[in-house]
């Protein structure tokens, strides 16, 4: 257990009313587990998450608002702890898990993973009780203009267990790292299990370079999960081809407000 993170959570939930109220509301959230084609889906009715799910992420809206992850724009009550030389760890005031963190870069730089994946692995080591996740700029990130990771406590995502049970085709093995394709339709999940940081990065870069980039985008559309399991790194990569489903913009009875970030996948 990372005592610095636990202390931050405790202090923020006792002193910051917004976070305090939303974490209390999370305990009243309705949850239902259903299985579809053998895959477990955890349905959560969490009205407080509308702030993120309905966030406007078009270029015009982003340019017109102050970046809520820049240090100068944080609420006065929001405190953080440093991580490495470029990040700070914050309590997410709109939680989806019992312990939910946001880890933004101190500088205002775009949401891009390729040259920051190493930092993501380091964060998984530092916050060993957490799963680290990255949402691409057009894959659920509510701040696509500011580099950040998020973290949720282990045990709240079904993929943790399914990553062990649903390994299908072994794609490639390189030294102490293996790339698997999971049998978890309708998702398309690639899983890397690596015994060293170097081989995890090598296989991730291989997958990244093989993925197609959408026209006009600098980065292939993807969501990424990382956590430590004993001495190994587990990396789940979820390729994407669309930001929001057609039902998001549909009208009338066909409208369903679903905005898929990694947590929802």
Question: Where would I find each of the regions flagged by the language model?
Answer:
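Active-site acidic/histidine clusters and adjacent loop/turn architecture
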Residues: 63, 82-91, 97, 101-114
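A short glycine-rich, hydrophobically flanked beta-strand micro-motif that places a catalytic Asp/Glu
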Residues: 130-143, 217-228
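Helical (often loop-to-helix) elements that flank the catalytic cores of nucleotide-handling enzymes
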Residues: 152-176
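ATP/Mg2+-dependent ligation/transfer catalytic cores
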Residues: 1-79
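Intrinsically disordered, low-complexity linker/loop segments enriched in Gly/Pro
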Residues: 106-128, 133-136
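Histidine-centered divalent-metal-coordination microenvironment in nucleic-acid enzymes
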Residues: 100, 137-161
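Active-site/ligand-binding surface loops and adjacent short beta/alpha elements
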Residues: 174-228
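Conserved small/polar residues in nucleotide/adenosyl-binding loops
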Residues: 263-265
């Amino acid at each position: 257990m990372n005592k610095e993170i636990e202390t931050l959570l405790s202090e923020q939930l006792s002193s910051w009313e917004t976070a305090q109220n939303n974490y209390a509301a999370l305990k009243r959230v309705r949850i239902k587990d259903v299985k579809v084609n053998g895959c477990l889906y955890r349905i959560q009715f969490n009205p407080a998450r509308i702030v993120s799910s309905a966030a406007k992420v078009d270029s015009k809206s982003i340019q017109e608002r102050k970046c809520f992850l820049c240090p100068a724009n944080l609420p006065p009550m929001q405190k953080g702890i440093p991580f490495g030389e470029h990040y700070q760890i914050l309590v997410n005031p709109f939680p989806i898990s019992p312990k939910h963190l946001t880890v933004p870069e101190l500088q205002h730089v775009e949401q891009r993973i390729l040259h920051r994946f190493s930092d993501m692995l380091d964060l998984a080591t530092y916050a060993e009780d957490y799963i680290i996740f990255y949402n691409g700029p057009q894959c659920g990130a509510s701040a696509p203009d500011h580099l950040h990771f998020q973290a949720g406590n282990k045990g709240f995502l079904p993929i943790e267990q399914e990553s062990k049970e649903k390994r299908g085709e072994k794609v490639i093995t390189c030294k102490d790292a293996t790339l698997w394709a999971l049998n978890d339709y309708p998702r398309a999940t690639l899983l890397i299990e690596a015994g060293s940081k170097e081989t995890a990065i090598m296989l991730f870069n291989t997958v990244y370079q093989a993925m197609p980039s959408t026209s006009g985008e600098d980065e292939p559309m993807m969501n990424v999960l990382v956590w430590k399991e004993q001495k190994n790194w587990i990396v789940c990569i979820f390729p994407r081809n669309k930001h929001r489903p057609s039902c998001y913009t549909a009208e009338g009875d066909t409208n369903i407000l679903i905005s898929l970030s990694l947590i929802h996948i």
